[in-house]
Amino acid sequence: MAGNSQRRGAVRKPGTKKGPTVGSGGVRRRGLEGRGATPPAHMRPNHPAAKKARAAAKAQQQRAGRKADETELVLGRNPVLECLRAKVPATALYVALGTDADERVTESVQIAADRGISILEVPRTDLDRMSNHGLHQGLGLQVPPYAYAHPDDLLATARADAAPALLVALDNISDPRNLGAIVRSVAAFAGHGVVIPQRRSASVTAVAWRTSAGAAARVPVARATNLNRTLKSFADAGLQIVGLDAGGDTTLDELDATGPTVVVVGSEGKGLSRLVREHCDAIVSIPMAGPTESLNASVAAGVVLAEIARQRRS
């Protein structure tokens, strides 16, 4: 048989004799020790799934950036007039052709003209398209994106003032009306600014502007990438961090806020988050005579800011 070196008369070529099968001595096995399970596809840098995930994340970030830079269109006769009365920054007033000019339309056009805001008459179909067929009643006010400050800017502003620093931080407040009302209270009681998280928080929209009664033009609002780190930096700068909660172990009557202070207001539903609580020097509750369990976030902030202002006048 061909290739059978065991047959009689066969001659084996030198160096072709196979020896006994020998393993690696455990080298390959030891080389694999400690590596653990194979990571999922999206965690392997060169895997198509990982590349796809990175591309999706980048696209989402770009969309978020574009959204943050987009202008806002306030719709309806009452909302537009309220924004103009509150001196909300605006770049254009759109009036649909053929709109009945009642008192609200007339006053809106007059205020816009006095402030140098462009007044543009457009076909109603154009305003329908611009508003995604929202209820505009023939009026639309274009509002530019709000220019947010940096948290460090608030500290610099506070240090330039003779009075001790007074800042308000919002822990995931989602209602822009609460944000606007808090900004208004900060302005009324000599606060130096408001800090909001960059994500999962109300932003300074036209609704917030309107609720603030124009105070957003005087009180800087800063966005924090990480609210907990920002609170820690405030604490390192010597500010007292005071959280508000109905179940706080310190009452407002016991609080001493004559020194530099940050008041942290929790979200409307869940209150202060666990990590934010851990950064607070005190959790303060507001004494109430009636059976009401808690106050609205903006009302609670206003009560505390009024008390701090009283302490600092004494």
UniProtKB/Swiss-Prot annotation:
UniProt source species: Mycolicibacterium smegmatis (strain ATCC 700084 / mc(2)155) (Mycobacterium smegmatis)
Name this polypeptide is given: Uncharacterized tRNA/rRNA methyltransferase MSMEG_6073/MSMEI_5913
Positions of region (Disordered): 1-71
GO cellular component: cytosol
GO terms for biological process, alphabetical: methylation; RNA processing
Binding site for S-adenosyl-L-methionine: G266, I286, L295
Enzyme class (EC, first level): transferase
Family: Belongs to the class IV-like SAM-binding methyltransferase superfamily. RNA methyltransferase TrmH family.
Single GO MF annotation: RNA binding
